Structure formats: C-alpha cells, structure tokens
Swiss-Prot record:
The lineage of its organism: Bacteria, Pseudomonadati, Pseudomonadota, Alphaproteobacteria, Rhodobacterales. One of its GO terms (biological process) is sulfur compound metabolic process. Ring cyclization and eight-electron oxidation of 3a-(2-amino-2-carboxyethyl)-4,5-dioxo-4,5,6,7,8,9-hexahydroquinoline-7,9-dicarboxylic-acid to PQQ. It comes from the Bacteria. The keyword Oxidoreductase applies. This is Pyrroloquinoline-quinone synthase. The keyword Oxidoreductase applies. GO terms for molecular function: pyrroloquinoline-quinone synthase activity. It comes from Cereibacter sphaeroides (strain KD131 / KCTC 12085). Disulfide bonds: none annotated.
Length: 255
C-alpha cells in the first residue's frame, strides 16, 4: 500500500526562512497526506461495502477519542499561559462542553447510523492493533518531543478541509446508508480545522528560528502523515484484502 513519494518532494535543502519552511510543509502535505491513500479513494468513491465503512468508522473512533488526550498533553508542555488558552478550545471541540456536543459525540452519531453498537465502539475492543499502536505513537510523540514539534505535528489540519469536503459529497452521493445527519462531524470540521491550522502555522513560523528547528517542524508533519497513513494501510490489509487479525471487528459479510 505504500507509495513512492521520493520524487514528489523537492530535493532536501536548508530551510533559511519561514517562507521556505511553509513551502516545504505544503509540499509534504501534497505528497504525503492521507487523501492520496487508495482506501480513501475507495471510501469516497462508493467502492466499499457497508461493513467496510463500519470498520473504518470503528477504527477511526479510537483516533477521534484520543485527540483530546493528545491536546491535553500538548497543553501540559507549555508554561506560557496564552498558548494554553489558545489550545484549550480544542479539548471542547472534541470532548464537548456542558450542554454542547463535541466531535466525539458527532462521531458516535456516525457509528450509530452505521448500525454499530455504541458500547462496543466506545470499548475500542474491536479495533485493529495497528490502529492502537499508531494512535498511541502520536500521543507519545507530543509528550516526548519538543513543544515546537508537538504543535507542528498538528499541521495536517492545513490539508483537512479538502478531504472533509470530498468525503461529505462522495459518501452522500454513493451510499444509501449515509445521510447529512451522520456526516455532521465532517461538516463542523470544515470551519474548525482551518482555524486550528492557522494558529499552528503562525506558531511554527514564529518559533522555528533556525534551519534545524524548521527541519524538525517538517519532520513532525511527516511523522503525523505516517500516523494517518498507517491506519489506512491496516484497514486496507484487513478489510479489503481480507486479513482480519484475531479479536478485531469482523463485518457481517465477512463472517
């Protein structure tokens, strides 16, 4: 499932300015973001069965419910109050607030609509091992690397609105079991992701002051694209090629 991306990026060069770094970041996104993955092409093009879509939503839930954990870790890395305040809204975006639903609630509306038992989804017992390992690696990254790299790893949000728009239109067009209500998560992220990406980009442009720091920012983005890509590789291997590991969710048509 891996694509050869070596020819998609310009040759390595010192990043002598914030503009050069941003150009490099956008090259990385164009070449490595998971909108290029064959599993997403199948998902958005109506080529998956209901059971395969269930498997995707079930596994992706683990990523969604871990995002606020990751963001709490990011907040804990900063002594700067202004940065903590800015980042704090991300927790409410996903966890919700009193009287207001969040992204996790909206994702569960999707899994409910797909016919998955909510308690089973929330237990995460049916997810693929690779899903768990990839998502946990992301949390470890923001905990163990520099605060600058922790923020830089979130820069995949620069490229998220396009995939959300494609997903909304594609899935509504191709699947009779998909409706606007269950796609509410992606609709909300059309406005949330650009706001978050703008802040993260401003932050790394201001705080990555040396070529080495700018390279670290770019490598953090590469790492995050690998986290996302690995999850799709695992889904394709299990639910398209049919190699479901023991203990993982098995769609009805594969039983």
């Amino acid at each position: 499932m891996s694509l050869d991306l070596s020819t998609s990026l310009s040759p390595a060069r010192p990043l002598e300015s914030a503009d050069a770094m941003e150009e490099r970041l956008r090259e990385i996104g164009a070449a490595r973001y998971h909108d290029r993955h064959p599993f997403h092409h199948m998902l958005h093009g109506g080529e998956l069965t209901r059971g395969q879509v269930q498997a995707w939503a079930l596994n992706r839930y683990y990523y969604q419910c871990t995002i606020p954990v990751k963001d709490a870790v990011v907040i804990s890395r900063f002594r700067d109050r202004a940065t903590r305040i800015e980042w704090r809204h991300r927790l409410e975006d996903h966890d919700g607030a009193e009287g207001a639903e969040g992204g996790i609630d909206r994702w569960l509306i999707l899994t409910d609509g797909l016919g998955l038992d909510r308690a089973y989804v929330e237990s995460t017992e049916g997810i693929l091992p690779a899903t768990r390992f990839a998502v946990e690696a992301y949390v470890h990254f923001v905990r163990d690397r520099s605060p600058l790299e922790a923020i830089a790893s979130c820069l995949t949000e620069l490229f998220a609105p396009n995939i959300h728009a494609t997903r909304i239109s594609g899935m509504l067009s191709h699947y009779d079991f998909i409706n606007p209500t269950v796609m509410a998560y992606f609709q909300r992220r059309l406005t949330q992701a650009p706001r978050d990406a703008d802040y993260a980009l401003r932050y790394v442009r201001e705080h990555a002051r040396t070529p080495e720091e700018r390279a670290a920012v770019c490598n953090a983005l590469i790492f995050k694209t690998q986290v996302l890509w690995t999850q799709l590789d695992a889904l394709h291997h299990a639910y398209v090629l049919g190699h479901v590991p023991p203990g993982a969710f098995v769609p009805e048509e594969m039983r």
